[in-house]
């Protein structure tokens, strides 16, 4: 399987530390009930709650202010929501130990990665293990991500679709895979680095001067509005995926807002803004993370008023405190479940595993199975 991974271009499969990103030395096993009741159903419920949050933000200036959405993004988000712009996908990160309800840690709403691994690699691993007789033929996996993407493309796009990202191997692999699913859906994908997109002042164009009608951009909305193109008139001539309304959800600032909307929800953790004493009492055990950060950067884990883990990074700005939900410990390995939605429907999971409480870019990806003896 590692040879296949290397051929697919996963140069980041082995980091400088020597840690293998794709790790098939172990796998996680779930019962059908655990998947259906504890992961799939809560994921759908949280996804619906997030749509309610967007509706609330569009209607109430105070919610926009609390979330801290940049002013230049607010009108884009409102217009996108009112148009009913379609969404492709997203990933909820959950803490789940098999005994209590899964807890939402955060929502990767705008630019989620580790998609190819979840949709393709672990499914290939499952087929290999069944073929080799290592796993019983009845073994399954919660994974309809690939087929769901193909069907969603048919709903939200037509004709030519451009795919753009930074010149980063992980981002490029994600974009190439999504372009492949779009092609299966009957669309005509065109991929390019995001820095090769041009602007005529009326339309965005690719490096062959073809107009960009629909753009899947693996590039955060808050960066787009800061770039030179953010204020361009061409913004109104292109359909974006993910749509601008997803920017409302692509911040950890939604965590205290969700808790305020649904206090006591079994799949939410109490959360507050770090600078707001009016929030819930977290009892001296919490995780502090910047509202806008990536790959587990600048996170501080506090237990019983003592710092037990910190991560480095360059992210600053407002932060949130979220009640500590210790990740389950399997011989020193701590998994986070990435629960994928396509459209608004739960369709599969991928698991990242590390040694600490914070998932970072060095956390390994492990496959999973569903098996009922």
Task: Label each residue range with its predicted role.
Residues 1-373:
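Preference for protein termini
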């Amino acid at each position: 399987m590692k040879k296949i991974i290397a051929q697919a271009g996963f140069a980041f499969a082995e980091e400088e530390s020597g840690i293998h990103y794709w790790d098939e030395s172990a796998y996680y096993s779930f019962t059908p009930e655990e998947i259906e009741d504890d992961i799939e159903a809560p994921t759908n419920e949280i996804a619906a709650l997030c749509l309610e949050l967007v509706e609330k933000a569009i209607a109430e200036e105070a919610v926009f202010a609390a979330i801290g959405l940049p002013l230049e993004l607010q009108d884009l988000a409102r217009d996108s929501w009112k148009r009913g712009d379609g969404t492709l996908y997203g990933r909820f990160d959950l803490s789940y130990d098999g005994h209590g309800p899964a807890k939402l840690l955060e929502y990767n709403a705008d630019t989620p990665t580790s998609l190819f691994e979840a949709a393709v690699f672990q499914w290939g691993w499952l087929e290999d293990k069944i073929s080799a007789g290592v796993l019983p033929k009845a073994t399954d996996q919660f994974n309809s991500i690939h087929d769901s993407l193909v069907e969603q493309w048919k709903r939200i796009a037509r004709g030519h679709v451009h795919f753009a990202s930074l010149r980063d191997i992980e981002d490029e692999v994600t974009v190439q895979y999504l372009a492949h699913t779009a092609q299966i859906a009957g669309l005509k994908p065109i991929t390019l680095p995001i820095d090769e997109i041009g602007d005529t002042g009326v339309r965005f164009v690719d490096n062959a001067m073809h107009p960009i009608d629909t753009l899947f951009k693996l590039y955060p909305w808050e960066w787009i509005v800061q770039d030179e193109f953010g204020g361009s008139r061409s913004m109104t001539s292109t359909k974006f995926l993910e749509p601008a309304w997803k920017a409302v959800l692509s911040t950890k600032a939604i965590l205290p807002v969700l808790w305020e909307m649904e206090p006591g929800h079994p799949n939410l953790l109490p959360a507050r803004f770090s600078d707001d004493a009016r929030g819930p009492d977290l009892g001296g055990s919490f995780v502090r993370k910047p509202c806008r950060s990536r790959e587990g950067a600048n996170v501080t884990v506090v237990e019983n008023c003592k710092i037990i883990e910190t991560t480095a990074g360059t992210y600053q700005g407002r932060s949130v405190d979220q009640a500590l939900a210790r990740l389950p410990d399997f011989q020193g390995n701590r998994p986070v479940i990435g629960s994928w939605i396509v459209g608004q429907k739960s369709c599969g999971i991928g698991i990242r595993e590390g040694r600490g409480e914070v998932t970072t870019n060095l956390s390994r990806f492990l496959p999973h199975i569903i098996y009922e003896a």
